[in-house]
């Protein structure tokens, strides 16, 4: 009887140990002061981690996931772009709303080759859009992709990639399409897509392989649609319209596939200690210096 009693007690102790080990991860986080917003936001974080991160670092993300700070960069930049569009489309009515007329070329925000000395235009052009389809496409992509990226990587890193794409877009346009104006946030949006695209390719088997092909097809479809509109704006716009450059799309994508990929692949690492980051920055700065030299001494717009 004593032996049976001891065996029963050992069985109870083992069960208690198992229960302790199987304590929900959310409860552990609550004990540490984390995850207080469970269960709704925890579910969102879990979904985001599956789409944005490879398997090895998802647990790390979930252990420290929170909404502080919230994804303010993408939200604020989207609101600013929408406000500028409303200003030019409603408060300063154009002849047509779907494709805004030449009024946007008079904006102090638009990148214009003949006003390149106003250096802010190399960044501020992202706030001006050429029509409803243009702004809806950019806002949709940067919200759907940018907010989850910012939840994972936070605003500083996402902002770095986004603005690197914007600046790369205007500088590339000044070289490869030097006589055309430039509007739209496509450089920044394509930088986010480029960084995410490279992460999906490199970590294809670890980022939900079943959905990997679907995600790639969605990205390709969006890029094809947006590039089609950009080419229309550049080459087939009506005579009374305002042709704009499309070089920002390509340059933004390359910025994303270099700087963006490095930034987004360093979720659980110190970015400044990653040699890939400095290689990407060095290449970016070299291209920037060449673009500045070209604009000062070689540009046909001089």
Swiss-Prot record:
Any matching Pfam family: Rhomboid
Enzyme class: hydrolase
Molecular-function annotations in GO: serine-type endopeptidase activity
Resulting phenotype, residue 186 to A: Abolishes protease activity
Superkingdom classification of source: Eukaryota
A Gene Ontology biological process term: proteolysis
Listed EC numbers: 3.4.21.105
Keyword field contains Thylakoid: no
CC per GO annotation: plasma membrane
Disordered as annotated region, ranges: 1-38
Xref: SUPFAM superfamilies: Rhomboid-like (SSF144091)
Active site: 186, 249
Biased composition, class Basic and acidic residues, residue ranges: 16-38
This protein's UniProt keywords: Cell membrane, Hydrolase, Membrane, Protease, Serine protease, Transmembrane, Transmembrane helix
Impact upon substituting residue 185 to P: Reduces protease activity
Catalytic activity: Cleaves type-1 transmembrane domains using a catalytic dyad composed of serine and histidine that are contributed by different transmembrane domains
Modification after translation (UniProt): Proteolytic processing of the proenzyme produces an N- and a C-terminal fragment. The processing is required for activation of the protease.
TM stretches of this protein: 71-91, 127-147, 158-178, 182-202, 211-231, 244-264, 277-297
Disulfide-linked positions: none
Free-text function comment from the UniProt entry: Involved in regulated intramembrane proteolysis and the subsequent release of functional polypeptides from their membrane anchors. Known substrate: EFNB3.
Entry's family note: Belongs to the peptidase S54 family.
PANTHER family assigned: RHOMBOID-RELATED PROTEIN, RHOMBOID-RELATED PROTEIN 2
UniProt name for this protein: Rhomboid-related protein 2
Top-level taxonomy: Eukaryota, Metazoa, Chordata, Craniata, Vertebrata
């Amino acid at each position: 009887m004593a032996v049976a009693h001891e065996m029963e007690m050992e069985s109870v102790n083992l069960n208690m140990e198992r229960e302790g080990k199987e304590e929900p991860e959310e409860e552990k986080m609550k004990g540490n002061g984390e995850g207080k917003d469970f269960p709704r936001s925890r579910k969102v974080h879990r979904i985001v981690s599956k789409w944005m991160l490879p398997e090895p670092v998802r647990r790390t993300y979930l252990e420290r996931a929170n909404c502080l700070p919230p994804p303010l960069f993408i939200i604020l930049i989207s609101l600013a772009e929408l406000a500028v569009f409303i200003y030019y489309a409603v408060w300063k009515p154009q002849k047509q709303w779907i494709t805004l007329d030449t009024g946007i070329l008079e904006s102090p925000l638009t990148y214009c080759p003949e006003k390149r000395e106003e250096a802010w235009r190399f960044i501020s052009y992202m706030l001006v859009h050429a029509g409803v389809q243009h702004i809806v496409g950019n806002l949709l992509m940067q919200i759907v992709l940018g907010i989850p990226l910012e939840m994972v990587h936070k605003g500083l890193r996402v902002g770095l990639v986004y603005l690197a794409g914007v600046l790369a877009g205007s500088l590339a346009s000044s070289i490869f399409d030097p006589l055309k104006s430039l509007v739209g946030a496509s450089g920044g949006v394509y930088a986010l897509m480029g960084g995410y695209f490279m992460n999906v390719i490199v970590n294809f088997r670890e980022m939900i392989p079943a959905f990997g092909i679907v995600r790639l097809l969605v990205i390709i479809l969006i890029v094809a649609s947006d590039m089609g509109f950009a080419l229309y704006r550049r080459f087939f716009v009506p005579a009374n319209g305002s042709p704009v450059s499309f070089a920002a799309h390509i340059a933004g994508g390359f910025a994303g596939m270099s700087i963006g990929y490095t930034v987004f692949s360093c979720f659980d690492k110190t970015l400044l200690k990653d040699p890939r980051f400095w290689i990407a920055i060095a290449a970016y700065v070299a291209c920037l210096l060449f673009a500045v030299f070209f604009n000062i001494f070689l540009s046909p717009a001089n």
